[in-house]
Amino acid sequence: MLNFEQFLKKIDQNYYENEFEVRYGQTVMNTLHRVWPEKYKQLSGGEYDCFYNDGLAESTLKLLQKEWK
C-alpha cells in the first residue's frame, strides 16, 4: 500500500489528468477506493464522504492522515 504522501500525489495526478471532468472530492474518494477499499467503505455515505461535497475534502484528508496505516 502507498504511504500517505504517495496517496496525496496519486490524488493530484488523477485530478490533473481529469481536470474539469471530475471534482476534487470525487478524485479523493475514487483514489481511496483503489488504494484502501476497506477505508473507502467505512467513509462512504458518512460525514467524511467528500464524493459529492468538495468542502469536506480537507477534513477527509486530515482524518485519513491520522488513520493511515
Locate the predicted segments by residue.
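C-terminal alpha-helical interaction appendages
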Residues: 1-69
